[in-house]
Amino acid sequence: MVPTSVTRRYQDLASKRIDLIFFESPEWGWKNTAHEVLGLGGTDAEVYVARNLPGRDQHYFDDFDGKRLALYSGYHYGFADFNSDRDYLRQHFKAEFSYSHDSNLLKVLHDRADITVVAESFLQLFLDKNPGSAQQLLVSTRKDQVYHHQVLLRPESPVSAKELGRLLERLRASGELKVLLQRYHLHASH
């Protein structure tokens, strides 16, 4: 395991610092980095989250004009046509950035941001740890994006996509992959 960041991961794969990266999507800025793709078998979705206030409903998420957005730096969001450039997001949306989904949810809860965007799986993990927050949050039924988690590998990685696929298939066949995905509130897609 090698630590990397959201923005550095492209360079790390290209420079051979890492061989593969789990829970990725080729749609998240990988077009200029050589890679192979292997389906992981899990799906997730990004949802909008705001404070649950009297009179506020799902229409609150229809328009972001004038609303303060708490976003994860380097992430690609559907509402912004997957443009992750901070300057673009600040200019076109009232966006502030952090490196913590917990922090972004707390900003919403403490009225320091109006909306954040998080994966449904992360939101459920957050609510597992903070059950009292569930009534305080309004979660959109509209998804920012739905994605199938994948593994991205360097073309000359010591572990080939075919070999990793065989290992994942063994986990899938034994039911272990489904159990692992469910532990993190991910939906098995196979």
Each model region followed by its residue ranges:
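Short helix-initiation/N-cap motifs at beta->coil->alpha
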Residues: M1-Q11, A95-L106
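Periplasmic-binding protein-like
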Residues: T43-V47, P131-E169, H187-H190
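Ligand-binding clefts/hinges and TM-proximal coupling segments of bilobed small-molecule sensing domains
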Residues: H76-F93, E169-H190
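Short amphipathic alpha-helical coupling segments at ligand-binding clamshell hinges
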Residues: Y60-D63, K67, A119, E156-R170, ...
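A ligand-binding cleft/hinge motif common to bilobed small-molecule-binding domains
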Residues: A14, F22-T33, D114-Q145
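Short, well-ordered beta-strand segments
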Residues: A70-L71, T116, L152
